[in-house]
Amino acid sequence: LLLFSSFEVNSSNDLEAAAINIGDKAPDIVLESPDGKVMKLSDLKGQMVLIDFWASWCGPCRRENPNVVRAYNKYSKAKFKNAKGFEIFSVSLDGSKNAWKAAIEADGLVWKYHVSDLKKWNSAAAALYEVRSIPASFLVNAEGIIVAKNLRGNQLDLELDKHIKSL
């Protein structure tokens, strides 16, 4: 039992060491939108970007979506100190395009950047960012560096407020 516990500690430490961390360069995500258009995270360089991993079938994600919508509406026109603006890059872990599109519509996710490979937990983007639970988010600055992770509710506002000149 002691060996097993010891193995578990080492295993989780190894996973933590390999994880995407604050201060790391955000890996590029290149996936298709619901209408089949290829969208790249790197196209948003120069802006503050919230990478938001979610799915239509995820209750906690759907409950968090109103906070994300509110933040988008509040900050999408804000003046930032070192960025051209604020954008959301939503990555869905859905398997059904219809369910994904319906959730975007139902939850009022009005921003342009919605992507998925419709592979659920086998999503290339989820693997790249080592996402093991959703909702998960990464705030990326204008230089493409991750400045915060897993911001929910007013935590997103508090972090974005550090980077704005005026609303």
Where is each model-derived feature located?
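Hydrophobic h-region of N-terminal signal peptides that target proteins for export
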Residues: 2-8
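N-terminal "domain-start" segment that seeds a small globular fold
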Residues: 10-42, 161, 165-166
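Conserved Rossmann-like nucleotide-binding pocket used by diverse enzymes
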Residues: 27, 40, 51-54, 89, ...
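Short active-site neighborhood of thiol/selenol oxidoreductases, capturing the structured segment around
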Residues: 40-62
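Alpha/beta-hydrolase fold active-site loops
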Residues: 48-49, 86, 135
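Conserved helix-turn-beta segment immediately C-terminal to the redox Cys motif
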Residues: 63-90, 162
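Short, internal strand/loop/helix patches
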Residues: 89, 94-96, 101-138, 142
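Thiol-/selenol-based redox modules, centered on thioredoxin-like
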Residues: 134, 139-167
